[in-house]
A protein has these predicted regions:
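Secretory targeting and sorting signals
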Residues: 2-45
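Catalytic-loop region of hydrolases
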Residues: 43-114
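Short, surface-exposed "cap/lid" segments of acyl-processing enzymes
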Residues: 95-156
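Alpha/beta-hydrolase active-site loop
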Residues: 150, 177-199
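Primarily recognizes the serine-hydrolase "nucleophile elbow" in alpha/beta-hydrolase
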Residues: 192-262
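Accessory cap/linker subdomain of secreted extracellular hydrolases
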Residues: 242-336
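Short beta-strand/loop motif that positions the catalytic acidic residue
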Residues: 339, 344-348, 352
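Acidic catalytic loop of the alpha/beta-hydrolase fold
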Residues: 349-358, 384
Length: 411
């Protein structure tokens, strides 16, 4: 597997030790807040505007033009990805506070197949980092490593794939990492963008599945909870979500002082970006100000140099212990809206070193108690290896639901 990553086409050769560390840190997603949202009225597909060349594509017009969530601001036709047409899109979405924003993403449509009735899989990427250069649409090494298997398996089955970059990855601003409402909106709105880009031939009639692991698993789960009120017009059929960080407080206890400290630091920056009143900088000591400044544009492969540190190393007061931070964190706990569509949930077993297993099981139990159609599976391995060992099952689960194969609940 490491050899395969080293030899990805068109990429420089990475040292084996670097790749090993990278894979060990592929991580996380956590939160969001389920708040009532007024859904946008679906718009008919209109002629799309071609976006600017280069990285200027990712900078939206200022002021942001009016638009409903999922409306395409502009797009770019890219080189085909295998046997799929590829489009880069900048689209309207909503942030954690419900305010309009612009998010980038990628849409892949298999060639040689009718788009009529073609399933659309919205893939939430796992953790890639905070820097704009890490965005999934820019094909960073870590994004390709963890997402390409999902993409290939979906395309081989004839499914279109829509993958968001999330808020603040590629686009201006700090990535709102781990903020479930922001990520859930982005995951749903990239499907709308795929349906509204005339070049794809897709529409609201196409069945939709949500897919992701780690940060992507959390994003998919949040999209599932938000969909009934935020995007009710989507023909949602199923969800496959693994390694879900459903309870940030529970996850943070394992990360602070542990192998995944960098992920906790990313979460702190994500919360601060989504909720400016939290004012992370006011809690930082001199070391913390330097650390978070240097850290804020890293990709995940460079984050492996920060294990076993603690927030107390960088703060005068640990913000996670304050009332303001606790209130926002408590808003982020998954489980308030149980999914009504078949949902495949899975986790590393017996121990997940990055996303604590007990809180994932607790979310499953919450959904099951509410009567949700859940299928649960344990995968022997750690957080990183389960990314790869689970991919076939996760995509197959969606395929079976698209094909109306009978579903058996396994709570």
């Amino acid at each position: 597997l490491i050899d395969m990553f080293q030899r990805l086409p068109g990429r420089r050769l990475w040292p084996r030790t670097k790749i090993s560390s990278l894979v060990a840190m592929l991580a996380l997603s956590m939160l969001g807040a389920v708040l009532p949202v007024v859904s946008a009225t679906p718009a008919a597909a209109a002629a799309a505007v071609a976006g600017p060349a280069g990285d200027d594509f990712y900078t939206p017009p200022s002021p942001l033009p009016a638009g409903n969530p999922g409306d395409v601001i502009w797009y770019r036709k890219q080189a085909d990805s295998g046997n799929a047409s590829s489009y880069l899109v900048l689209y309207h979405s909503r942030d954690a506070l419900g305010q309009p924003n612009a998010v980038s993403g990628t849409i892949l449509v298999p060639k040689g197949r009718s788009p009529v009735g073609m399933p659309i899989v919205s893939l939430g990427s796992g953790t890639v980092g905070l820097g704009d250069q890490c965005a999934p649409s820019k094909n960073s090494l870590v994004s390709v490593a963890q997402n390409q298997g999902f993409i290939d398996k979906a395309l081989q089955r004839g499914f279109a794939v829509a993958m968001t970059d999330y808020e603040g990855l590629g686009t201006p601003g700090v990535h709102t990492y781990v903020i479930g409402r922001s990520e859930g909106h982005a995951v749903l709105d990239v499907v709308r963008a795929a349906q509204r880009l005339p070049e794809t031939g897709l529409s609201t009639a196409n069945p939709v599945g949500l897919l992701g692991y780690s940060q992507g698993g959390g994003a998919a789960a949040w999209a599932g909870e938000l969909q009934p009120t935020y995007a009710p017009e989507l023909n949602l059929k199923a969800i496959s979500a693994g390694g879900i960080p459903a309870d940030l407080l529970a996850v943070s206890q394992q990360l602070d002082g542990g192998l995944g400290f960098a992920v906790l630091a990313m979460a702190a920056l994500g919360l601060d970006s989504a909720y400016p009143e939290l004012d992370l900088e006011s809690y930082l000591n001199a070391s913390g100000k330097k650390f978070f400044t240097d850290f804020s544009d890293d990709c995940v492969e460079s984050l492996t140099i920060y294990p076993f540190r603690k927030l107390s190393d960088y703060t005068t007061i640990n913000p996670l212990t304050t009332a303001a931070w606790k209130a926002r964190i408590n808003e982020q706990k998954l489980g308030a809206v149980a999914p009504k569509v078949p949902t495949f949930m899975y986790h590393a077993w017996p121990i997940d070193e990055l996303v604590a297993r007990p809180q994932g099981v607790a979310l499953k139990d919450t959904y099951c108690a509410a009567g949700s159609p859940i299928r649960w599976k344990d995968y022997l391995g750690d957080h990183a290896t389960v990314i790869f060992t689970s991919q076939s099952d996760a995509v197959s689960f969606l395929a079976d639901r698209f094909a109306n194969v009978p579903f058996s609940r396994s709570c």
